């Protein structure tokens, strides 16, 4: 995977590596053009950044999570970053959660912006169960994956049964996003403090707003190690 690096925060390696995963049909350079890197730097946050070209080709050939591990996360750990956060937009949010699901203990936290949450029939199945008064746990008990490699179903199982010692998971989305119904279901698996919304749809204006709000929560260090 191609990776754009931004290591301007500290004289030496920062304590935290923030890995940004773009959405489908989106290049890492777009995250730069839309001000995501600049927003981090304006706040003086002491993090190194890696913008990953996790494009759809890796999804189509089934190598997305393995390539993230071999090309990005495992080398980052080997180079000394022990605190790693993933931040993903749309398909990038799906990739971030799917990676954490498959690699326990590798990341400290995940920030998902308008994440893709799997095929629509599955999301509709979950929504129907909730509308009938069944809990997410009850839905899960009666639901079966399509096959042994049904990542969409596995992701929802992970969301519903996420371990207490797993990575901190945050969700943000526009209230008019075309996937907002799925986001509202995902929000039911999270503490309210880890869910934020903004006016707008599946587009950059709400994403920029939500990114800024998340950066201002104080989750990332503001001082470099001495």
Question: Which residues fall in each region the model found?
Answer:
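Non-catalytic cap/lid and distal C-terminal segments of serine-dependent acyl enzymes
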Residues: 1-226
């Amino acid at each position: 995977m191609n990776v754009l690096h931004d290591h301007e925060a500290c004289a030496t390696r920062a304590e935290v590596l923030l890995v940004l995963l773009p959405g489908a049909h989106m290049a890492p350079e777009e995250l730069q053009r839309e001000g995501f890197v600049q927003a981090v730097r304006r706040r003086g946050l002491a993090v190194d950044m890696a913008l990953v070209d996790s494009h759809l080709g890796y999804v189509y050939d089934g190598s997305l999570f393995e390539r993230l591990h071999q090309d990005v996360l495992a080398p980052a750990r080997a180079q000394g970053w022990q605190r790693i956060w993933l931040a993903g937009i749309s398909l990038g949010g799906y990739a971030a959660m799917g990676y954490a699901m498959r690699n326990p203990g590798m990341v400290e936290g995940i920030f998902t912006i308008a994440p893709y949450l799997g095929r629509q029939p599955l999301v509709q199945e979950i929504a129907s169960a909730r509308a009938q008064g069944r809990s997410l746990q009850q839905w899960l008990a009666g639901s079966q994956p399509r096959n042994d490699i049904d990542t969409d179903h596995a992701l929802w199982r992970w969301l519903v049964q996420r371990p207490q010692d797993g990575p901190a998971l945050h969700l943000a989305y526009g209230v008019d996003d075309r996937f907002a119904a799925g986001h509202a279901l995902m929000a039911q698996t999270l503490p309210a403090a880890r869910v934020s919304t903004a006016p707008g749809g599946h587009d950059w204006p709400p994403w920029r707003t939500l990114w800024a709000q998340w950066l201002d929560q104080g989750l990332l260090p503001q001082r470099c190690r001495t």
